[in-house]
Each structure stands twice: as C-alpha cells, then as structure tokens.
C-alpha cells in the first residue's frame, strides 16, 4: 500500500494497494462503504502524471527538498529552543515531534504559538477521541520555505524558553 498524497500533491488522497484479489476486494468494499470512492477524474489525473514523469526521479527530488527543510528545522530548534524541550530526529516523512516537560501548560503554549502565527498541532489531534492530549506537538516542514522554517523556529524557540526556562 502507498499514497501519492505527499509525493505528488498534498491532500490528493489517491493511493495504491497490491495483494491477493479477495483481500483487495474486501478493502475496496470497506473503503466504498466508509469514505466513498475517489473521484475518477482525480485518479485519471494521477495516472496521466505517472505516465508522463519519471516518478523515481521526482521522488528523489522530493526527498532532497524535505531533507533540506528537515535539516533547517532541526538546526534552528537546536539553536533556539530550550534544552528542556525534546525533538524527534525524523528518519523520513515530513514531520517532527516536539515534547514539552510535564509541568508546562501546553494549552497556553499552543495559544502563544498561534498568537505569533507559528502553526503547530497538538498531539491529541492524532489520538482516538482526542485522548492523550499529552505534551507533544507535531511540527511540519512541508509547506514553509527554509527561511520561514528558521523564522518560525526562532519564535517557537523563544516561547519554549519563556515557558520552560533555558
């Protein structure tokens, strides 16, 4: 199974699945009953793009772009953030997880980030029924430029020091 959502266009929601025919039929029936079928025009556009481009070369370029942006995020975090805040070292994908100390009011931290136009997502958004609000945030480096990432991380870093100390 795989997706073209992040490699061709964010939000595309078109993917692929290989496997035994009976398994694929069951998955397709479940998908059609729960989320409906993807518009045929979207699927045809993806098929045309895949017939037109060198997808492997495209993936290599996407990986380079995201690695550059990830490195910018990590470098800026290490430069600006409180030493009490932890950041995962991504091994792929487009997101890093930042974990705050347990004694920090993460709702207030989140609001302070939003007030300063720094977009982060609370970890509870990725948990069933909002459970596990916890003290972690997802940071994305897909859309912003390297300069925007650096500026955002400088602001975020200052806020981590304000909320957590050095």
Q: What are these language model-derived features?
A:
Residues 1-166:
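PLP-dependent class I/II
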């Amino acid at each position: 199974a795989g997706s073209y959502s992040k490699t061709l266009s964010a939000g595309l929601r078109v993917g692929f699945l290989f496997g035994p025919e009976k398994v694929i039929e069951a998955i397709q029936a479940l998908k059609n009953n729960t989320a409906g079928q993807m518009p045929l025009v979207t699927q045809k556009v993806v098929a045309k793009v895949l017939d037109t481009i060198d997808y492997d070369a495209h993936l290599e370029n996407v990986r380079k772009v995201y690695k550059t942006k990830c490195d910018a995020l990590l470098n800026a975090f290490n430069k600006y953030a409180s030493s009490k805040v932890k950041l995962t070292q991504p091994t792929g994908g487009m997101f890093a997880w930042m974990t705050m100390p347990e004694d920090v009011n993460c709702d207030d931290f989140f609001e302070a980030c939003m007030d300063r136009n720094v977009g982060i997502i609370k970890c509870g958004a990725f948990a069933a029924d909002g459970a596990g609000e916890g003290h972690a945030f997802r940071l994305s480096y897909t859309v912003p430029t390297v300069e925007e990432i650096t500026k955002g991380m400088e602001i975020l870093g200052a806020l981590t020091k304000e909320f957590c100390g050095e």
